[in-house]
Amino acid sequence: GIRDVERSRALGDVYKRQSDYCMYCLGWNYSNGEGVEQNMTEAIRWYTAAAEGGNADAMHDLGWHYDHGEGVEQDMKKAICWYERAAEQNHPAAMNSLGECYAMGRGVPRDLETAMEWYRRAAELGEAMADYNMGWHLEQAGKLSEAYAHYRKAADGNDDSAWWALGRFYENGVVVAQDGKEARRCYETGEKLGSVKCKMRLARCKLLGIGGRREKKAGLDLCRQALELAKESSEKEDYGYEAEMNLLRRTIAENES
């Protein structure tokens, strides 16, 4: 009867969603070399199949590959299209990615107001990176208390760059009382999460004795190592990255004699 037809349709929908998710997982495995040899062509093939089937994670990841030209030729039109389709399904990372595109004028006209709106929506859904991005733009606009609040929220969500931002605020006494020990703790936390910017700052802290004992020789070695690592890092596109490298270069030069 009608109920049997409805049940069959519902089951069909479940199977389809599971199938789309499995295709997404295959794409992710090929993209990251997890359990299989890394193969970007296969990754894109499976991401595309899953995205066309309606999987929002696949839509976002496929958009990211088109955005960054990884495994496919860079195509910002397709990147924006897939980000938007994922965002329509309330995918927080896709909303954040759209925010980044509008903030940088990548594939769309630069529009900071629209960028901040996408960041806000993503942050409300728990996307820590969106809180960090909002914090950065608020900091650049001189709204330091608001920036600090977003950095703190992002750090609570384990965003590594947010720990770098908080460390700078404590190191320089911005909005909060100057506290070298707390600055160093922030950098240590961010470094453990993989932040190269935190690694650069932490090396500098050890060399200059910020928040702890000064270790000139060991500090210099750490600074040089951090700088070499920074040159090769995929973080290079991050806000403030070039300025951090320049600060570390200056610190090394001033302390080598």
Residue ranges and their predicted role:
Residues 13, 49-50, 85-86, 121-122, ...:
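Canonical positions in the second alpha-helix
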Residues 23-32, 59-68, 95-104, 131-140, ...:
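Hydrophobic face of amphipathic alpha-helices that form TPR/SEL1-like repeat modules
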Residues 214-232:
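TPR/TPR-like (Sel1-like) alpha-helical repeat modules
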Residues 1-18:
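Single conserved hydrophobic/aromatic residue that forms the stacking wall/gate
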Residues 17-20, 32-34, 39, 52-55, ...:
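Short helix-capping/linker turns of helical repeat alpha-solenoids
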